[in-house]
Amino acid sequence: MNQLSDRLNRLSPSATLAMSQKSNELKAQGVDVINLSVGEPDFNTPDHIKEAAKKAVDDNFSRYSPVPGYPVLRNAIVAKLKNENGLDYTAAQISCANGAKQSVCNTIMALVNNGDEVIVPAPYWVSYPEMVKLADGTPVIITAGIDQDFKITPAQLEVAITPKTKALILCSPSNPTGSVYTKEELAGLAAVLAKHPQVYVIADEIYEHITYSGKHESIAQFPEIHDNVIIVNGVSKAYAMTGWRIGFIAGPEWIVKAVNKLQGQYTSGPCSVSQKAAEAAYTGTQTPVEEMRQAFQRRRDLIVKLAKEIPGFEVNNPQGAFYLFPKCDSFFGKSAGDRNINNADDLAMYLLEVGHVACVGGTSFGSPECIRMSYATSDENIIEAMRRIKEALALLK
């Protein structure tokens, strides 16, 4: 008998983690799989950050931390927001968590009531709608296709807002598309939101430092909506620290207090040693961040070039993050042997089993006509993966 809670039965498993698990199973059987499904940098954490963590261990810095994180880390985040983003916050407006994923979930759980609507632009990160459902809210999906560079318009946002709307989740740079909102585009959205002060913005900026066409722009910069914006960020992507699990929110103090209250009952403060590592990330040299960004840009250029050479792919040109999100519906209805391709998930599984390349079908991202490829891997892997994909797709008739 299934005695799980209704809220858990409503949740869908993570498609990205499922594909990664399937890829690892094939690897364990001796199959040479190139994994383009993973959403994390392939670089190592910079040395000065690791040294800070080692020192913390040697100094026995291993006690419970305050729920929102140590003041020294929160002050480092305040300085980062001022120096890099031109935004003014205090330490009381910062709450650190076990990764940006928890920060997003904390914020949704603190804001959303049963029946509240949360606008989620599609394509979206797979966990956004599930987190809204976990909070007994209703995800309202706005779809922006490749013809819009996967970015919603002010007109679309205006139509989606109702008296039940509580929040908008906005991810820029985007996972899964790599699209980046410009200052002008954000200003257009802010103008709409200013007319609806009951709507909060959860601004996921975890890929902030991985951009290829200029400075990152935050929607929190617009005074007319600043007090309704909750920034989510962290060290995972920019500093290659996915396993250290430090994220944060920056927002109105009353929301931060609510998040602290929630987190105090769930997980308490984040890992003390990881906080020292994150402090070193924010206060130390930023040279490794730029070096990784340049490598990602080179890989972006490479994978876009190779993907455009594959007949049947419609390819976007991502301006940030480390994902390509080609449209692949021209292959739907085709087959190779007993393998039929009806949707992007079928195509992703076909590429894994026949081409031995792991990608993620777009259905769980709200875009069933696309697949996501991560180029957080070596140039050699990208070249070989795209060769395999091209050969496997050529077999479909």
Each predicted region: which residue ranges?
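PLP-dependent class I/II
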Residues: N2-L4, L8, S12-S14, M19, ...
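A glycine-/small-polar-enriched, mobile loop at the entrance of the PLP active site in fold-type I
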Residues: S37-E40, K55-L73
